[in-house]
Amino acid sequence: MDMNKSSFVPPFRIQLAVDGSEHAVAATQLIRDLPLPRNSLITILGVVPPGQSLYESKLRAALMQAEKTLGRKTVETEVVLLYGHAAKQLIEYGSEHRPDLMVIGAKGLYATLKILLGGLAQQVVEQAHWPVLVTRTPYHGLRRVVLATDGSQNSRLAAEYLAEFPLPHHAEIQVVHAQPLLEEAATFAHHMGPIAYLTPSMPLQVDRPTLSHQAELQKQRGRAILAETRRILEGGSHKAKGIILDGDPASQILAYSELRGIDLIVAGSRGLSAIEGWWWGSVSRKLVHYAHSSVLFVRTEAENNVPE
């Protein structure tokens, strides 16, 4: 998707993985609610795993139902049936036909088939070089959206993507910056050299005045991150509110989203460098597994050129 503002809004290319499960139905309904630009293309993908030919007829019915749900005059739809292991097929198809967005259900219909399960969602999120939206039920529309940011370049790319994303006009966006407790961050950084883990026998003496000063600097940085992120969103005509949370980012984002009834969490798939942003590394994985809402992980071609 072109990030440059212009009077022409380019068509949006979406790849939707369908298996007939309630999560895939929710994904279809979510896409239906997006105000997509004219001539956008929705490719509805079905994957028949090895040795499961009897599943094909059920899958074809699910694909036809999804196409019927998504049918509209201004948007093109096509159905593609793939054969093989789901993660491999989706990644290969996405690599060949670069989407602006790939959408998959968090869980699949038949656990024994291992189609579109949480494990698959994690594989696709980690391997894809394009944005991936993992949907969950129940789906009640996109009313409240959280953009999680840690101030990294990848978070900036996520904000730029969301600024141009075709959200429903009534959707409210909240920018959340979750910063770990300073003592925890300082302790981890102190031991990041040859030892990458902590035990109770590894205390770190932290000077309180220094901590107080660092805490104030951290707050200032957090406010600056929120201000810059909101500026990016407003460039795409999306108004947003900002909030700073203290504590483990994944836990704070999950708790805040559940408390506020958030419908969609948006995050970059990678964060800061290992030392400066150690707390962000596992956030995307935790969001895939534990979020009650749908989650959009933003990876772009530009991100591939961002240093770790």
Give a label for each model feature:
Residues 2-58, 69-75, 144-209, 232-241:
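Small/aliphatic-rich secondary-structure junction motif
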Residues 30, 36-39, 44, 58-62, ...:
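Aromatic/pi-system hotspot detector in well-structured domains
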